[in-house]
């Protein structure tokens, strides 16, 4: 997604738990167009720091594409609870906390134009398949989070949210590892 936006000539703040995985992208685009920032969505301070660094560097954020997530396949009875909880921490709570920070940023920093918040859930969140029960539950939780009370933010102009949505895409391969 970041490279697609960069190819259109737009400015991007690309985040990853291990920013060095973005070095190839960083080599292709100038610092005036691309900022890479360490962001582990399981760490609330990382979230705050990433938004602060974006403001310091570019002054505003117009779009947040919330895409963190990971999955481990396996039968429910064989899945270690600790691993399932860690997956929920990232897939639901991490995405929810980034959403919360984005809403606050759009309201406080981008007056009056606000911003666009897109949360990438997963097709498995609405059309689950065997072996991905915990993953599907975490992604469905994010989908419902967006579609319920949080979606009402777009109805209240004081929140400065132009759009808040959730996409449910198929899985994609990634070189970014958990």
What are these regions (language model features)?
Residues 155-178:
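SDR active-site lid
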């Amino acid at each position: 997604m970041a490279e697609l936006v960069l190819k259109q000539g737009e400015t991007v703040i690309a985040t990853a738990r291990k920013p060095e995985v973005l070095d190839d992208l960083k080599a292709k685009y100038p610092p005036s167009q691309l900022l890479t920032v360490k962001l582990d969505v399981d760490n609330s301070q990382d979230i705050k720091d990433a938004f602060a660094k974006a403001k310091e560097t570019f002054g505003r954020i117009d779009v947040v594409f919330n895409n963190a997530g990971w999955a481990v396949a396996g039968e429910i009875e064989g899945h270690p609870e600790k691993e399932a909880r860690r997956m929920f921490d990232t897939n639901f709570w991490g995405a929810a906390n980034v959403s919360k920070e984005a809403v606050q940023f759009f309201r406080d920093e981008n007056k009056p134009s606000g911003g666009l918040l897109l949360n990438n859930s997963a097709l498995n969140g609405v059309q689950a398949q065997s072996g991905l029960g915990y993953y599907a539950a975490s992604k469905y939780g994010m989908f419902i989070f967006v579609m319920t009370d949080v979606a009402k933010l777009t109805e209240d102009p004081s929140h400065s949210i132009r759009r808040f949505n959730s996409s449910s895409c198929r899985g994609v391969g990634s070189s970014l590892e958990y």
